[in-house]
Amino acid sequence: MEKKTIVLGVIGSDCHAVGNKILDHAFTNAGFNVVNIGVLSPQEVFIKAAIETKADAILLSSLYGQGEIDCKGLRQKCDEAGLEGILLYVGGNIVVGKQHWPDVEKRFKDMGYDRVYAPGTPPEVGIADLKKDLNIE
């Protein structure tokens, strides 16, 4: 079976490279073709990479607390670019301060994200979810 392709990166003005490398390593070892666009990445770069690579999913991370602002509108931009239905995952420290996680998760799902991960979620959880969502295994 052909490897599924994912676009991975750190959204917005966030430069946390270590977590991004860990995710890249974990998803690559799990059998995915990872297109890592790195840190400090605007939405348009994720979209362009997804189109160019015919990606099956876009995985965004954020650690600096501004993920909610950075992630807003991505689903609509994906749809407008012809990426209707592409899986969108986001995780990390995606909001400012300590907030009730179910409320945070709901806000991101309302923005069109398929999966939303709290700080400290092991990569294996995202890998299992992605395999399930892509009907792998």
UniProtKB/Swiss-Prot annotation:
Residue span, B12-binding domain: 3-137
UniProt entry tagged with the keyword Signal: no
PROSITE patterns: B12_BINDING (PS51332)
Associated pathway: Amino-acid degradation; L-glutamate degradation via mesaconate pathway; acetate and pyruvate from L-glutamate: step 1/4
Pfam families hit by this protein: B12-binding
NCBIfam families, per the entry: MthylAspMutase, PRK02261.1
Subunit structure: Heterotetramer composed of 2 epsilon subunits (GlmE) and 2 sigma subunits (GlmS). GlmE exists as a homodimer and GlmS as a monomer.
Protein name: Glutamate mutase sigma subunit
Organism encoding this protein: Clostridium cochlearium
Lineage, top ranks: Bacteria, Bacillati, Bacillota, Clostridia, Eubacteriales
